[in-house]
Curated annotation (Swiss-Prot):
Identified in a complex composed of RNF43, LGR5 and RSPO1. Also interacts with other R-spondin ligands, including RSPO2, RSPO3 and RSPO4. The gene is LGR5. Residues 25-66 form the LRRNT domain. This is Leucine-rich repeat-containing G-protein coupled receptor 5. The lineage of its organism: Eukaryota, Metazoa, Chordata, Craniata, Vertebrata. Changing residue 864 to A: Impaired internalization to the trans-Golgi network.
């Protein structure tokens, strides 16, 4: 008689007594058999579950109940098992010894376990399968030997395991298939040999496993298969050969007539032959992506009526769409990363049941009509070369829910291309060439992506998308129709609609509100009100508007607006006045005057930039969102940004040159040396202009973009390239201010005490010092802003940053000429000379007036000339032309006490 049956028969009296006796087994025998520190609980009326896991045990507990059906000894320190350690556990069905330190299991270790069905020995240190310990466990159904160090499987180790259904041998060190050991496992249904070091599968390796349904061989080193290696696997439905080193298509699968799921992705297979799956008509799913496939036979996937999923990723050499005749039940088709340039017009006739189509990362240029694919729910065509979407491309796809057309070259979409897609909720058209967007038939969209279409600058009304939840637009201004600003505006209008009505109307509205509130419950009223508010804020739109992407006004706040207008007016008028007095004056232009005139000219460009921004703000007042994208991408914004940076940098460079010129002039005058030629100064001015042009051209060359914001200025935050550019500008300007400070400090220190009054009373020296001080002070907040952004200091609000960029940065452009006009006497002299010259020019245009009294006119002319020319014993160094420089008998740096002199001959 079978020993297992004998054990059960011997235990029947005890079971009958427990079942019919008055005392409860839970309170009697069962609980008395629970080892110390273990957790025990009843398993039905007569059996016990014992959990002794993770207790640090080094040996098996000895006082186990005979009625134990489940014993968990995993995660302990058990290193060995003695023969017959659990002799009385005839009812034990599951034994867990995982996560211990077992290196060897002796014969008889599981003797007496007649009912054992599940044995877990994973995560130990076994180097081979126990030769005799597992034999004759006739009830065993599941055996786990994974995550050990097994490199050898004895031929007879599984003999007697007639009930074994599941065998885990994965994550070991096997180098070959243990063919002899598997011959006794005729009832085996699932086996995994994954994560080993198997190189080859010989013929008839699984010849006696006729009941095997699932076989996992992934993550090995298999490079070859015997042509008959799968013979005998008549019931196999799942075969996993993924992540191996196969070089050729596994033609041995043709004998697997019941195969339903096949995976051999991530190998080195380069071709799939014609009629590759002719012997596998039951295939439902095939995964063979991430293979360097160069050739696929056109008939490779024909006549697979049960195939539901076909996935081929990374087949970079496929140029033709496969012929899928007879594979009419395909539901999911993925062919990505290939070079397919066209689709057959009959693709939907072959695949009428297709639900998911993924042809991303191909070279498709033109699309056929998918109208026959009535069951399509998802289409992914991103990263192709599609140029146009015709009216019939997606016509009558009533089940289509997701359509991805991103990263193509789509420039034309027929107005009714999406008009017959009632189920469409997700549409991705990002990174195309769209300049317009059709809205017909898209009222059910919940997700819409249009980002990257830089030519799409028009606003899209939120009323056309009542169900929309997430939208991505090319420009932040287009989110104003969906954002908080617009919602708040609507709410404000609703609450303020009756502000101008009469008191009687207000009382009527209040009465109506309270009457409606009385007619229904107050809580329902409040809930409805909250839902209305949430509905207004339900759409998530990106990129979101903000201070640098405004919805209504380019210059938010009247403080900034008035500041920009003031700077524009003062910079234009004052710099124009200074430039006119310097360059149109009949008096001789000294080097320092030339520099002041050039500085005024470049400062005028800053005034032009501020004036243009103020004009754009006025033109788009209250509706900047309608024009924001046009302004950012227009030539005007880039020109204004270029002029702003050029003018700012030129002003700093020229001011540095002026400070150095003053220092050199004092040095040469003190040493009775000849000054540098006037032409050299002009060359240096030209070099400063070229350097400023170079700095201003960097954003146009890709370092950053002037059109990144409507302010047309590189912002001191955001992309690293933009931040680096701004920091470079600040460092360069700081270096210039340092040079100016050193030059003037050296000038002061090198003067004798008696010369101080003469030098510091000179108007031009003091004027440059004043410019140095004001410009340096105004440069500090800009420098602080740039460096704080560099180290991620976020305590500065965007409004403050905007004020600094629009008001503080261009402020020197209007202060520089004002300081010259108000505090420099040379301006008054030049202005008087200009007025006299203008007067003479005007009189010369009217000869009748000149002939009234010619004698008086001649006398006035001579008097004027004599008034301009003053002979003195002091020599003038810089206010005379080079040809009239006298000998330096009395060297003076500049005309500190005398006016500028010009020699004009008397008429």
């Amino acid at each position: 008689m079978d020993t297992s049956r004998l054990g059960v028969l011997l235990s029947l009296p005890v079971l009958l007594q427990l079942a019919t006796g008055g005392s409860s087994p839970r309170s009697g025998v069962l609980l008395r058999g629970c080892p110390t520190h273990c957790h025990c609980e009843p398993d039905g009326r007569m059996l016990l579950r014992v959990d002794c896991s993770d207790l640090g045990l080094s040996e098996l507990p000895s006082n186990l109940s005979v009625f134990t059906s489940y014993l968990d000894l995993s995660m302990n320190n058990i290193s060995q098992l003695l023969p017959n350690p659990l002799p009385s556990l005839r009812f034990l069905e599951e034994l867990r010894l995982a996560g211990n330190a077992l290196t060897y299991i002796p014969k008889g270790a599981f003797t007496g376990l007649y009912s054992l069905k599940v044995l877990m020995l994973q995560n130990n240190q076994l180097r081979h399968v126990p030769t005799e310990a597992l034999q004759n466990l006739r009830s065993l159904q599941s055996l786990r030997l994974d995550a050990n160090h097994i490199s050898y499987v004895p031929p007879s180790c599984f003999s007697g395991l007639h009930s074994l259904r599941h065998l885990w041998l994965d994550d070991n060190a096997l180098t070959e298939i243990p063919v002899q050991a598997f011959r006794s496992l005729s009832a085996l249904q699932a086996m995994t040999l994954a994560l080993n070091k198997i190189h080859h599968i010989p013929d008839y390796a699984f010849g006696n496993l006729s009941s095997l349904v699932v076989l996992h061989l992934h993550n090995n080193r298999i490079h070859s298969l015997g042509k008959k290696c799968f013979d005998g696997l008549h019931s196999l439905e799942t075969l996993d050969l993924n992540y191996n080193n196969l070089d050729e298509f596994p033609t041995a699968i043709r004998t697997l007539s019941n195969l339903k799921e096949l995976g051999f992705h991530s190998n080195n297979i380069r071709s799939i032959p014609e009629k590759a799956f002719v012997g596998n008509p039951s295939l439902i799913t095939i995964h063979f992506y991430d293979n360097p496939i160069q050739f696929v036979g056109r008939s490779a996937f024909q006549h697979l009526p049960e195939l539901r999923t076909l996935t081929l990723n990374g087949a970079s050499q496929i140029t033709e769409f496969p012929d899928l005749t007879g594979t009419a039940n395909l539901e999911s088709l993925t062919l990505t990363g290939a070079q397919i340039s066209s689709l057959p017009q009959t693709v939907c006739n072959q695949l009428p049941n297709l639900q998911v189509l993924d042809l991303s990362y191909n070279l498709l240029e033109d699309l056929p009509s998918f109208s026959v694919c009535q069951k399509l729910q998802k289409i992914d065509l991103r990263h192709n070369e599609i140029y146009e979407i015709k009216v019939d491309t997606f016509q009558q796809l009533l089940s289509l829910r997701s359509l991805n057309l991103a990263w193509n070259k789509i420039a034309i979409i027929h107005p009714n291309a999406f008009s017959t897609l009632p189920s469409l909720i997700k549409l991705d058209l990002s990174s195309n060439l769209l300049s317009s967007f059709p809205i017909t038939g898209l009222h059910g969209l919940t997700h819409l992506k249009l980002t990257g279409n830089h030519a799409l600058q028009s606003l899209i009304s939120s009323e056309n998308f009542p169900e929309l939840k997430v939208i991505e637009m090319p420009y932040a201004y287009q989110c104003c129709a969906f954002g908080v600003c617009e919602n708040a505006y609507k709410i404000s209008n609703q609450w303020n609609k009756g502000d101008n009505s009469s008191m009687d109307d207000l009382h009527k509205k209040d009465a109506g509100m309270f009457q409606a509130q009385d007619e229904r419950d107050l809580e329902d009223f409040l809930l409805d009100f909250e839902e209305d508010l949430k509905a207004l804020h339900s759409v998530q739109c990106s990129p979101s508007p903000g201070p640098f992407k405004p919805c209504e006004h380019l210059l938010d706040g009247w403080l900034i607006r008035i500041g920009v207008w003031t700077i524009a007016v003062l910079a234009l008028t004052c710099n124009a006045l200074v430039t006119s007095t310097v360059f149109r004056s009949p008096l001789y232009i000294s080097p320092i005057k030339l520099l002041i005139g050039v500085i005024a000219a470049v400062n005028m460009l800053t005034g032009v930039s501020s004036a243009v921004l103020a004009g754009v703000d006025a033109f788009t007042f209250g509706s900047f969102a309608r024009h924001g994208a046009w302004w950012e991408n227009g030539v005007g914004c880039h020109v204004i940004g270029f002029l702003s940076i050029f003018a700012s940098e030129s002003s700093v460079f020229l001011l540095t040159l002026a400070a150095l010129e003053r220092g050199f002039s004092v040095k040469y005058s003190a040493k009775f040396e000849t000054k540098a030629p006037f032409s050299s100064l002009k060359v240096i001015i030209l070099l400063c202009a070229l350097l400023a042009l170079t700095m201003a051209a960097v954003p146009l060359l890709g370092g950053s973009k002037y059109g990144a914001s409507p302010l047309c200025l590189p912002l001191p935050f955001g992309e690293p390239s933009t931040m680096g550019y701004m920091v470079a500008l600040i460092l360069l300007n700081s270096l210039c201010f340092l040079m100016m400070t050193i030059a003037y400090t050296k000038l002061y220190c090198n003067l004798d005490k008696g010369d101080l009054e003469n030098i510091w009373d000179c108007s031009m020296v003091k004027h440059i010092a004043l410019l140095l001080f004001t410009n340096c002070i105004l440069n500090c907040p800009v420098a602080f802003l740039s460096f704080s952004s560099l180290i991620n200091l976020t305590f500065i609000s965007p409004e403050v940053i905007k004020f600094i960029l629009l008001v503080v940065v261009p402020l020197p452009a209007c202060l520089n000429p004002l300081l010259y006009i108000l505090f420099n006497p040379h301006f008054k002299e030049d202005l008087v000379s200009l007025r006299k010259q203008t007067y003479v020019w005007t009189r010369s245009k009217h000869p009748s007036l000149m002939s009234i009294n010619s004698d008086d006119v001649e006398k006035q002319s001579c008097d004027s000339t004599q008034a301009l020319v003053t002979f003195t014993s002091s020599s003038i160094t810089y206010d005379l032309p080079p040809s009239s420089v006298p000998s330096p008998a009395y060297p003076v740096t500049e005309s500190c006490h005398l006016s500028s002199v010009a020699f004009v001959p008397c008429l």
